[in-house]
Regions:
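A contiguous active-site-proximal alpha/beta segment in oxidoreductase catalytic domains
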Residues: 106-162
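C-terminal helix-rich "cap/oligomerization" subdomain common to oxidoreductases
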Residues: 1-9, 67, 75-77, 286-335
Length: 335
């Protein structure tokens, strides 16, 4: 089900942010800079945290989502802790308020599917914040491999242990980004999952080596951990005719092609835009509200990526195929 487009007259969308953690602050900052958005307020139970942020951005701070909705919010960004996503999004959806939910969509796939169904029944837009899709280095890689016979994808996403306390490990915090990217780049279902997990220094897994096979035959690998002293984000894609390397931090993309019998090849650096990914993500959400376009990441897609991540966490039992219908999710366009 699609929602009725807002603001055909070009007026700004009244939008609020729930949660004043790292991502909530970033969402609020970017929304305050977007002409199409009217940041009506930010909500957090800790007003001592929320009020200085609100003052800096020229908006209001309130203590809960109910107050934010009462201020006339037409849409909300939910950037609260994951275990609160389902309850907060349900409150918004039942009031007819459109929602962008930070990844993962919910604590588990069942809650995620429930939100998708509720949004469909209510006729509101539901988008999931898989921000790496909007990294222009990733978008350049996708364009470079368009119509290519993809053979393999290898993604590295590593860094130091996060300073903030978290109730999840690297699979949900980091690898779920790359599960989404593998599905998006290949436009194919992930049908096999082979995870190797370890908790070297943390209570939850802080090392994950994840292998996948897609329905189209692509072999994919994710290497992620919290043990590397520096951040690194790289993607390597091998196709029948080229090899593409993307650095998601520096946003440099290199394409190797034209392999010759003597082992030589041609190499070129592809042009990459440098717009902040979060700005592109929020613009996609606002466009979905004002033009009835499909949001950049649908609720269905968010649920599928979470389901595959949960299969990885299941350890050895995750060797059972993890089947997800990418084509059906796109066709339904449930938001």
């Amino acid at each position: 089900m699609t929602s009725q487009a807002l603001r055909p007259d070009g007026a700004r969308v009244r939008i609020g942010v729930v949660g004043c953690g790292v991502m909530g602050r970033n969402h609020a900052r970017v929304l305050s800079e977007i002409a199409a958005a009217d940041l009506v307020g930010i909500a957090d139970p800790d007003l001592a945290v929320a009020e200085p942020i609100a003052t800096q951005l020229g908006t209001q701070a309130v203590g809960d989502i109910e107050a934010l909705i009462a201020m006339g919010s037409e849409a909300l960004v939910i950037a609260a802790p994951t275990h609160l996503h389902h309850a907060l999004a349900t409150t918004a959806i039942e009031r007819g308020v459109h929602v962008l939910i930070e990844k993962p969509i919910a604590s588990n796939p069942e809650e995620g599917r429930d939100l998708v169904q509720k949004a469909a029944r209510a006729g509101v837009t539901l988008m999931v914040g898989h921000v790496e899709r909007f990294n222009q280095a990733v978008q350049t890689v996708k364009e470079a491999i368009r119509n290519e016979d993809i053979l393999s994808i290898a993604i590295t996403r590593v860094g130091p242990f996060p300073p903030r306390m978290s109730n999840v490990g690297v699979v949900i915090d980091l690898a779920v980004h790359d599960i989404d990217l593998i599905r998006w780049l290949t436009e194919s279902d992930i049908v096999e999952v082979q995870p190797q997990l370890s908790n070297a220094v943390a209570e939850r897994e802080d090392i994950a080596l994840l292998q996948f096979r897609t329905a189209s035959g692509v072999l994919a690998h994710i290497n992620t951990n919290w043990l590397t002293p520096f951040k690194a984000r790289h993607i390597h894609v091998a196709t029948r005719d080229k090899y593409v390397i993307g650095d998601l931090i520096t946003r440099q993309v290199t394409e190797c092609s034209g392999y010759r019998p003597d082992g030589s090849y041609s190499m070129r650096h592809l042009p990459v835009g440098h717009t902040e990914p979060l700005r592109l993500e929020l613009n996609s959400f606002l466009k979905a509200l004002t033009s009835d376009a499909t949001p950049g990441v649908t609720g269905d897609e968010g649920v599928i990526s979470l389901d595959i991540a949960m299969r990885c966490l299941a350890g050895s039992s995750a060797n059972a195929p993890a089947v997800a219908d990418f084509a059906a999710a796109k066709a339904r366009k449930v938001r």
